[in-house]
């Protein structure tokens, strides 16, 4: 990942008069979803690009060392080698961007990747994920422990109460403390947009998170009733663009929650390309948080190469 985004001093004038035009956002969301996705060879290339941007995730109560090991193996070998050879991509080092786990499973992931001779980053959720309803000291200590165990990316989740009650300085101060606790680890800030009440709040929370030094802003925990949606994404991407114009600092974007199909990933890539440009279409600035997306991408690539859809036994690790 690129160098840390240092953030700025808190400037509430950047958000004080913001009002999001919801009808315009909804029209833009409908437009992007109505586009025809890329086809044939271009589609295979875009799907492989999507693979390299996935944070391959497991966040289940029954996670164990063994399924973390399988997750890490799949992260290193996301697409069957014969399929990559057919596309002349077998020597390109294609892996997922990272694996993402609970703090208690960080050591398992670090060990598994080390045993595989792989330097894929380990991301850990933190700060009382998914609700953030724990004491601040506890949330900060959780970050420090995850980093100590080997996580190099930390996906924190904000206290939604601070957004819903307009406590923007308190939100900024908390995220600044998260930034400090991360040390050299990169900070991804989950806004849990499905619980923020309005698109205007989504924009304001995005801007505060970036001012406070977030390297990425992320839509959702994946545990909310409403997760990554295109209207929310458009608002967050416009905030990223505005922040870049104001500061020259590039902040990454990570949608997460409910992204399951290869077609979904193509639409997300198209949205990034149109809203932020080609420079953001790389894992340093774009991630997709997903558990099952990779399996469908591999099935679509299998179909592209062989002309038929895979049976269950054809892709046993998917």
UniProtKB/Swiss-Prot annotation:
Pathway: Carbohydrate degradation; 2-deoxy-D-ribose 1-phosphate degradation; D-glyceraldehyde 3-phosphate and acetaldehyde from 2-deoxy-alpha-D-ribose 1-phosphate: step 2/2. SUPFAM superfamilies: Aldolase. The active site is at residues 155, 218, 254. Transmembrane segments: none annotated. It is found in: Cytoplasm; Cytoplasmic granule; Nucleus. One of its GO terms (biological process) is deoxyribose phosphate catabolic process. Keywords: Cytoplasm, Lyase, Nucleus, Schiff base. GO terms for molecular function: deoxyribose-phosphate aldolase activity. Interacts with YBX1. Belongs to the DeoC/FbaB aldolase family. DeoC type 2 subfamily. NCBIfam families: deoC. Catalyzes a reversible aldol reaction between acetaldehyde and D-glyceraldehyde 3-phosphate to generate 2-deoxy-D-ribose 5-phosphate. Participates in stress granule (SG) assembly. May allow ATP production from extracellular deoxyinosine in conditions of energy deprivation. This is Deoxyribose-phosphate aldolase. The lineage of its organism: Eukaryota, Metazoa, Chordata, Craniata, Vertebrata.
